Amino acid sequence: MKIIFLVLMMILSEVYSDRDGYPVHDGTNCKYSCDIREKWEYCTPLCKRRNAKTGYCYAFACWCIGLPDEVKVYGDDGIFCKSG
């Protein structure tokens, strides 16, 4: 019985998992920069377009809360921004 419960919990944790992080521009691994004086105005809509729950400006970049696993975040492909 315990094994069935553990397997069920592992399956549910995969289905309902989400994560927080800095979303990146496609193909560049560069964060979306923002103005910290406008904490929510730019980042919340940007994050919601990526199916996150919300987002805000943190350390001059958009931080999203509740991103789906398939959305790339800063650090997934290394830590360097490859612009241009």
Curated annotation (Swiss-Prot):
Residues 19-82 form the LCN-type CS-alpha/beta domain. Belongs to the long (4 C-C) scorpion toxin superfamily. Sodium channel inhibitor family. Beta subfamily. Disulfide bonds join 30-81, 34-57, 43-62, 47-64. Has the structural arrangement of an alpha-helix connected to antiparallel beta-sheets by disulfide bonds (CS-alpha/beta). It is found in: Secreted. This is Toxin Acra3. Residues 1-17 form the signal peptide. It comes from Androctonus crassicauda. GO terms for biological process: defense response.
